[in-house]
Amino acid sequence: MLGERGLWYKMHWFEMAARVPLLVHAPQRFAARRVKQSVSTLDLLPTLVELAGGSLEAGLPLDGHSLLAHLKGEGGHDEVIGEYTAEGTLSPLMMIRRGDFKFVYSEQDPCLLFDLRNDPRELENLAGSPAHAELFADFLAEARARWDIPAITGQVLASQRRRRFVADALTRGQLKSWDHQPFVDASQQYMRNHIDLDDLERRARYPQP
């Protein structure tokens, strides 16, 4: 977002932030096509498992669904479930995108319901529309059954307190950043006639202190 709706960055479920094209290139396996269904990156793992000839374990459920039907032009699901618990929101911000409709759910902000076919810019919130009252009620019931917002909020706040405690401790004495920073000595990283090639390759595969 670059100022649309007075918003910057993302941190919400409007199409300008949430809609990202997914490209699959496998010309020897699938004919070129464009699908209209909404899918998620959560669908990638089940797709790769099915492409590899594997099967999903009953005791290890996955949130996504295989995209093989989409790739073959045989239909496929049209649903995305989204969860946002980071900065820019007062409460966990959840989303159900199914078919033409998108429902955005929060305990602290008004719910949103959009008909993306007829309102692609998401300008008309149908949450209070009498004509969509039943659809709204169904989405709301599904969201409340799917997510325990008070429990999720409690987990988020507890995680924040733990991380703030550790961050404060790391600022005392010698500063230790949490940011991943691999320190590499370039003089020892490449072949520069200072070390036997076999030793260099061994160190590259099995780094030692």
Question: How would you label these PLM feature ranges?
Answer:
Residues 4, 125-128:
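Phosphate-coordinating loops and pocket residues in cytosolic domains that bind phosphorylated ligands
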Residues 1-4, 30, 42-43, 50-116, ...:
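C-terminal cap/loop subdomain of S1 sulfatases and analogous C-terminal strand-loop tails that border
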Residues 8, 73, 129-132:
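A short linear boundary/processing microfeature
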Residues 32-36, 55, 127:
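Conserved short-loop catalytic and cofactor-binding motifs
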Residues 128-209:
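Long, internal low-complexity/basic segments
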Residues 21-22, 44, 103, 139:
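Generic structural signal for small/hydrophobic residues in well-ordered secondary structure
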